[in-house]
Amino acid sequence: PLCLNTVQGYWVNLLRVRKSGVLSRHRHPAPVHGVVLRGSWHYLEHDWKATEGSYVFEPPGETHTLVVPENVPEMITMFHITGAMIYVDPYGRQTGYEDVFTKIEMCRAHYTKTGLGGDYVDQFIC
């Protein structure tokens, strides 16, 4: 993460993908903003492609499925996500979610496992 804001309920992170394929089908209750820093990707539900330098806006409530094409060795996108990521199945039924608080707990577990210590995440919380 770059920022985990518990007061306003958002997080900013760099999504790095080094393998092609479908990442997830999800939606958000609030707007999401992104900037593609490397590589490219697209949503199954749209005909546009997000390429290096592209600004991406995801409107609230829209379900989309992020896909990284086979010819892309690495994709990095900076996302600013407010509210939550709500994971859904092909029928739109919720299968899980992430918000700033679950992100913090995921980071604590990861940093503990890697030897940095769970409190390493505290520097990103604002």
Indicate residue ranges for each PLM-predicted region:
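A short glycine-rich, His/Asp/Glu-containing loop-to-beta-strand
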Residues: 1-24
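Residue-level recognition of well-ordered beta-strand positions that form the cores
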Residues: 14-16, 40, 80
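Ligand-binding loop in jelly-roll beta-barrel domains
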Residues: 51, 60-90
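Conserved hydrophobic/aromatic beta-strand scaffold that supports enzyme active sites
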Residues: 1, 12-14, 33, 55-57, ...
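Glycine- and acidic-residue-biased ligand/ion/polar-headgroup-sensing regions
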Residues: 18-20, 28-45, 51
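Short acidic-glycine-tyrosine-enriched beta hairpin
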Residues: 6, 41-65
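Acidic/histidine-enriched, glycine/proline-rich intrinsically disordered or flexible terminal extensions
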Residues: 86-126
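Histidine-centered active-site/metal-ligand motif
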Residues: 26-28, 64
